[in-house]
């Protein structure tokens, strides 16, 4: 493995070419490797075959397992987090935006509650990106008629489409981590729309989790996958929450009114 790792670290073509994506839990190709490949950053089996061919032709290294193990080590030594990099690249121009954001885009009331709810949600999203697994168990719920732009708002808030998902359908699926993997903001729409007392309790329990224990198919041992995402809800009805004597503090509803939006 040592010889293969040395090649990944110092070869002009391979050095810095693969990196471990801390958001997706996958290895990415982050610079050209001398052959045509798909636009996706994630390493594929075809990528690994080209890399093995390169090591065989140039260094007479042929052990598939050792090359794969060395590539994994090299990637982890060159890890990165795309959401953190994105957030660190932003420069504030001094203009306050959070206070009137939901009013501007969705026509929500421009009051203190709306401001504090969105501020809390954004702080939770940022904290989860920089400190995976931190405690954050509330959900911003946008309530309004169909076509009001609720889902679009969450998608745009994520920054990139691949950091957003609305594909979370079941909470008791053993593969639920795969639905969270690689996403920063996740919308729960169908579950909120059909919520009853039992399902609300399930959602509250799900929101309180700080990690999933999951074994990625190629791994030997299961690992704690600390949460890096936050959850938003959308509903067409303001009374989407059933009566709960223990309180529904985890759900922060905001009524939207697109007719009053400024865009």
Q: Which residues fall in each region the model found?
A:
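AAA+/SF3 P-loop NTPase mechanochemical coupling elements
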Residues: 175-182, 216-234
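A short helix-turn-beta junction within AAA+ P-loop NTPase domains corresponding to the substrate/partner-engaging
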Residues: 241-261
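Conserved AAA+/SF3 P-loop NTPase catalytic/coupling segment centered on the Walker-B
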Residues: 184-207, 241-247
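Conserved catalytic/switch belt of AAA+ P-loop NTPases
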Residues: 200-223
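Short glycine-/polar-rich loops that comprise or flank the Walker A/P-loop
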Residues: 182-184, 209-210, 227-230, 246-252
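P-loop NTPase catalytic core of nucleic-acid-dependent motor ATPases
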Residues: 71-181, 185
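N-terminal nucleic-acid engagement/recognition segments and initiation subdomains in replication
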Residues: 1-100, 112-116
């Amino acid at each position: 493995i040592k010889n293969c790792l040395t090649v990944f670290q110092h070869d002009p073509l391979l050095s810095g070419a693969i990196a471990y994506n801390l958001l997706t839990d996958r290895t990415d190709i982050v610079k050209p490797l001398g052959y045509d490949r798909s636009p996706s950053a994630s390493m594929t089996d075809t990528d690994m075959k080209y890399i093995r061919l390169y090591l065989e032709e140039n260094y007479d290294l042929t052990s598939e397992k050792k090359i794969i193990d060395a590539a994994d080590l090299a990637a982890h030594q060159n890890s990165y987090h795309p959401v953190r990099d994105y957030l660190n690249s932003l420069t504030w121009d001094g203009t306050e935006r959070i206070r009137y954001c939901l009013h501007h885009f969705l026509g929500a009331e421009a009051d203190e509650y709306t401001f504090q709810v969105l501020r809390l949600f954004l702080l939770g999203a940022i904290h989860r990106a920089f400190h995976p697994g931190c405690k954050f168990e509330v959900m911003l719920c946008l309530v309004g008629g169909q076509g009001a732009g609720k889902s679009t708002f969450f998608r745009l808030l994520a920054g990139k489409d691949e950091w957003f998902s609305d594909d979370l359908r079941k909470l008791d699926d053993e593969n639920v981590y795969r639905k969270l993997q690689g996403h920063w903001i996740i919308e729960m729409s169908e579950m909120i729309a059909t919520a009853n007392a039992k399902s609300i309790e399930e959602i509250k329990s799900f929101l309180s989790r700080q990690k999933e224990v999951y074994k990625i198919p190629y791994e030997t041992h299961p690992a704690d996958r600390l949460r890096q995402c936050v959850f938003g809800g959308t509903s067409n009805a303001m009374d989407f929450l059933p009566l709960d004597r223990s309180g529904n503090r985890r759900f922060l509803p905001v009524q939207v009114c697109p007719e009053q939006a400024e865009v």
